[in-house]
Amino acid sequence: MAHQCARFHFFLCGFICYLVHSALASNSSSTLCFWFPLAHGNTSFELTINYTICMPCSTSQAARQRLEPGRNMWCKIGHDRCEERDHDELLMSIPSGYDNLKLEGYYAWLAFLSFSYAAQFHPELFGIGNVSRVFVDKRHQFICAEHDGHNSTVSTGHNISALYAAYYHHQIDGGNWFHLEWLRPLFSSWLVLNISWFLRRSPVSPVSRRIYQILRPTRPRLPVSWSFRTSIVSDLTGSQQRKRKFPSESRPNVVKPSVLPSTSR
């Protein structure tokens, strides 16, 4: 009897643990982190982006809507027409964990805000789901985004990253080129540029410190007038050749000018 009671309690505890584990697993959030050096500086500003989440309409439909007031050639995801209210303006907030609001240089600040913007509003660029918050771990110098663990916030049928990555569409009637996904190459170039720049200026490596010392701004030097030097050399060479060719002792009939030519011009 005691053995059966112990077995019953064992299975009951196991079942309860399984339910708790399943609940935690379903509610657990994943974290995507990038190492980003948090160098301190004296420059900070905010980034405001005016954007529209729209796909390009078909050429014939865009031609019909081109002259209509308040319309353009971009359709919202899942719609076949693009209205003026589809536009929105975002004001980026600074992620928590970075209180002094300073980074080293303009490009670093733009890359920092670009990651925060992309992770919050376009997480499908990183292949993650709904992002709950973006934070900074100053101890490990990480910038992280917590998400729900799913692959994408946009359905597969309208996934811009999967369908239109690095693809250009030409509107025949307008004659303009529209980049269907501008955020991925823009953010990637900023991120690579800033990480390489911070790695080069990292105080950990003596080689990078030496490069930074070499690249420090120096006092400008006076420009050298190469034309002036060339004219002097040519004048000297010409005068020497004239002296060799026409010596004054052997040519008594040479008339010398009474007034020297003016060189002011």
UniProtKB/Swiss-Prot annotation:
Residues annotated as transmembrane: 8-25
The main location class comes to: virion
Q: Which residues are glycosylated?
A: 27, 42, 50, 130, 151, 159, 194
The answer on whether this UniProt entry bears the keyword Secreted reads yes
Recorded GO cellular component terms are: extracellular region; host cell endoplasmic reticulum membrane; host cell Golgi membrane; membrane; viral envelope; virion membrane
Its biological purpose is as follows:
Minor envelope protein.
Hey, which family's this protein in? Belongs to the arteriviridae GP3 protein family.
This chain's protein is named Glycoprotein 3
Organism of this sequence: Porcine reproductive and respiratory syndrome virus (strain Lelystad) (PRRSV)
